[in-house]
UniProtKB/Swiss-Prot annotation:
Residues 127-152, 246-256, 263-281 have a biased composition (Basic and acidic residues). The keyword Signal does not apply. Keywords: Coiled coil, Cytoplasm, DNA-binding, mRNA processing, mRNA splicing, Nucleus, Repeat, Spliceosome. Residues 157-204, 653-772 form a coiled coil. It comes from Neurospora crassa (strain ATCC 24698 / 74-OR23-1A / CBS 708.71 / DSM 1257 / FGSC 987). This is Pre-mRNA-splicing factor cef-1. GO terms for cellular component: cytosol; nucleolar peripheral inclusion body; post-mRNA release spliceosomal complex; Prp19 complex; spliceosomal complex. Residues 1-56, 57-106 form the HTH myb-type domain. One of its GO terms (molecular function) is DNA binding. Its main location: cytoplasm. Residues 113-192, 246-284, 424-448, 497-525 are annotated as: Disordered. GO terms for biological process: mRNA cis splicing, via spliceosome; mRNA splicing, via spliceosome.
Length: 779
């Protein structure tokens, strides 16, 4: 019984087709179809070109692709094989998307007109998807463009035979062709090694030859780097990378790494044993999905870059200088306003407040038209209109800006470039729409605090984009106007003036008291404070000056009692003074973390001169330093014994006692570590409980700020594009109006001439009719 080839593709057939294409290529479809008992070569080729080809895009259609599809469908109707490579989809995908767009547009219009019918799903009219669905008994005409049918649990005998034959043929590596390929690979490897050996010998002999074994369109993996992306030439700051590397190197612990690798190996071994025990296909699918999710997360984390913020434009020093300049200017204004000279007061005005009468507002981006809907209306209007042979008006179509934006195969794109000052409307003194406003309004282009009207509208503002020649010509014209104005002044009257100089009066001299600069005052006060601190530090004890350790708790009474037991009265005084100093330092200057009890004892303040005299007397009473030979002899004597100091008392201890002591110490350390870990966990939970909401709020605000910034950038780009488009459209409108006026004038002239010709011809005809001969009583 012959087998009817065709029908729905199965998953097994798809896998066999992909494996056979990888072996036989894209030209031997007869050999590929020999592995599939139910498919023809034409069906195999169609299946590969319409579904299995990795270059086929199966993602959602973008707006640009829809616009390009509709425009090309208008230019080349029903030529889907030609449209498909331009759009980047298959012909069947283009046709289905085109029909779906038309159906969606028709459905929107029907819903807008209220053509929904009565309520209830059974009473509604069938949709486009319902109409295209296959009815029971119908055969899909294009099964190559549909997803594969899942494999059944129990395969047919024909499918099992086909699968086994395909496995055997695709796994054949001992045939003539496989042996020839292996032999060719071996010969290629031997040639490569021979060339390498020859090149090495020539290099040792001082001869360098260039390797030219690279083929066109291929890569030499021995010389080139796969997927290499060379950085842009230039200088880069690697300080952050070096600091990050040093930080990682300092915090790297090889022991932790070894323990982590060991634990990871143990966990992988346990997971492998557990996977072997799980035979459920759903469990296997879940594990595979989890692995894919981990891979995607790893890719996302590797793609994520560190946040690089720009350096501040103004530093702290510059801010301080700006503040000082403002204070100096304000002080000068105050002095000028307090002066008795009217001329000085007239030249000073208030420049401290801003003109906030015209606040700057963020412009709203204009609403955009639905280009896809307009193009669909054009297509429907062209398909549903009657023939042009019947006459009537043409169907109105959306063209120009309201269409898809395609003038050819590629869309229109406004290229943002630096404006040319000779071509932009900046030099036209604000003429024309889209020009930069040259007067003070919503966008102030001059100083908002111009009290003396120094910046006139149309003065320098109109020369923003002017060339140096234009600026020079304008200066010359202003100078000429000034000369003309001075020349037009009336001549002064001839009057004799007598000036009497007032008597010189000696003004009382007042001592000018200049206010000291804040920085100089701060520096002087800081030096005085540092000198006082240094002097106070020198008055302290040597223990405090050298920052030596001090006792946490001091029993002053016990120290006094011990000092009183000495026989020498001088030593008693010295011991009492030492006890007083120790107690004073421990109480007044405690160690960090210590909590002294009681109040610091008062010590007698000694004059600096008396203190220096006492130090001098002490130095005179101190014995001379020992000679280096004596110190060396004592050192050799103390280090001649190999026994460490303090270990003599441990010679008789038993080994078991030492082990027990060390075990007790180890247990105490472990208990302390566990207690510290528990305390840290509690603190971490407490902080997460108190600060979790703030962290989430900060993350949400950060995302909103980034989204708002992106939206603002897009709106600014759109605004600039539409401004450029508006200026170009205004220029084109004038040209088109002039051309239309010329055409209308030409048509009017021709019509007038034709009317004149018709009038003369009519008059001649009437004259001939009146003056002509009569025949049978009729003219």
């Amino acid at each position: 019984m012959p087998v009817v080839k065709g029908g729905v593709w199965t998953n097994i057939e798809d896998e066999i087709l992909k494996a056979s294409v990888s072996k036989y290529g894209l030209n031997q479809w007869a050999r590929v179809s020999s592995l599939l008992a139910r498919k023809t070569p034409k069906q195999c080729k169609a299946r590969w070109n319409e579904w299995l080809d990795p270059s086929i895009k199966k993602i959602e259609w973008s707006k640009e692709e829809d616009e390009k599809l509709l425009h090309l469908a208008k230019l080349m109707p029903t030529q889907w094989r030609t449209i498909a490579p331009i759009v980047g989809r298959t012909a069947n995908q283009c046709l289905e998307r085109y029909q779906r767009l038309l159906d969606e547009a028709e459905q929107r219009e029907a819903s807008a007109l209220g053509l929904t019918g009565p309520d209830g799903g059974e009473a509604h009219a069938p949709s486009a998807d319902d109409v295209r669905k296959l009815r029971p008994g119908e055969v899909d005409p294009d099964p190559e463009t549909k997803p594969a049918r899942p494999d059944t649990i129990d395969l047919d005998e024909d499918e099992k035979e086909m699968l086994s034959e395909a496995r055997a043929r695709l796994a054949n590596t001992q045939g003539k062709k496989a042996k020839r390929k292996a032999r060719e690979r071996q010969q290629e490897e031997s040639r490569r090694l021979a060339a390498l050996q020859k090149r090495r010998e020539l290099k040792t002999a001082g001869i360098n030859i260039k390797v030219t074994t690279k083929k066109q369109g291929q890569m030499d993996y021995n010389a080139d780097i796969p997927f290499e992306k060379k950085p842009v030439p230039g200088f880069y700051d690697t300080t952050e990378e070096m600091s990050r590397n040093e930080y990682q190197r300092a915090h790297f612990d090889p022991k932790k790494q070894q323990v982590g690798n060991k634990r990871k190996g143990e966990e992988d071994e346990r997971d492998g044993k557990r996977r072997k025990g799980d035979k459920d296909p759903s469990v296997q699918a879940a594990l595979k999905a989890g692995q894919l999710q981990k891979m995607r997360e790893a890719e996302q984390s590797s793609k994520r870059r560190a946040l690089v913020l720009p350096a501040p434009q103004v530093g702290e020093g510059e801010l301080e200088e700006i503040v000082k300049m403002g204070m100096i200017g304000e002080r000068a204004n105050m002095l000028a306003r307090e002066s008795d000279n009217d001329a000085t007061r007239g030249l000073i005005n208030n420049y401290s407040t801003l003109n906030t009468n015209a606040p700057i507002r963020t412009p709203m981006a204009p609403a955009q038209e639905d280009h896809i809907a307009n193009e669909i209306r054009n297509i429907r209007a062209l398909t549903e209109t009657q023939s042009s042979l019947l006459g009537g008006e043409n169907t109105p179509l959306h063209q120009g800006v309201g269409s898809t934006g395609f003038e050819s195969v590629a869309p229109r794109k406004q290229v943002m470039s630096t404006p040319n000052p000779l071509a932009t409307p900046l030099r036209a003194a604000g003429a024309g729409p889209g020009a930069t406003p040259l007067r003070v309004g919503q966008t102030p282009l001059r100083t908002p605090r111009d009290t003396f009207a120094l910046n006139d509208a149309g003065d320098e503002m109109s020369m923003v984009g002017g060339t140096p020649r234009d600026v020079k010509m304008r200066e010359m014209s202003i100078r000429h106007q000034l000369k003309q104005g001075l020349a037009s002044l009336p001549k002064p009257k001839e009057t004799e003036w007598e000036l009497e100089l007032p008597d010189d009066q000696q003004e009382p001299k007042t001592a000018e008291q200049l206010e000291e600069d804040a920085a100089e005052r701060d520096r002087r006060e800081r030096e005085i404070r540092e000198a006082r601190e240094l002097l106070e530090r020198k008055r302290r004890t040597q223990v405090m000056q050298r920052d030596l350790p001090r006792p946490v708790q001091v029993d002053y009474q016990s120290l006094l009692k011990e000092a009183s037991q000495a026989e020498d009265p001088v030593k008693v005084l010295i011991a009492r003074e030492a006890a007083l100093l120790v107690a004073h330092d421990a109480t007044k200057y405690p160690l960090p973390g210590a909590q002294p009890t009681g109040r610091a004892l008062e010590i007698q303040k000694i004059d600096d001169a008396a203190l220096q005299e006492a130090k001098l007397q002490v130095l005179m009473e101190i014995k001379d330093k020992p000679k280096p030979e004596e110190v060396q002899a004592v050192w050799e004597k103390s280090n001649s014994s190999s026994l460490l100091l303090g270990l003599g008392c441990y010679e008789d201890d038993e080994e078991e006692e030492q082990i027990s002591t060390m075990q007790i110490a180890l247990e105490e350390v472990i208990d302390q570590i566990v207690a510290s870990a528990e305390k840290g966990n509690k603190l971490e939970k407490k902080l997460n409980l108190h600060l979790g909401g703030y962290k989430n709020r900060a993350e949400m605000l950060r995302k909103k700020i980034s989204e708002a910034h992106e939206a603002l950038e897009k709106a600014n780009n759109a605004l600039g594009a539409f401004k450029v488009l508006q200026s170009s459209e205004q220029a084109a409108i004038r040209n088109r109006l002039a051309a239309l006026r010329e055409e209308v004038g030409f048509v009017s002239t021709r019509e007038r001439e034709a009317q004149e010709l018709y009038r003369r011809t009519r008059e001649e005809l009437d004259a001939l009719t009146l003056n002509g001969p009569k025949a049978n009583g009729f003219r």
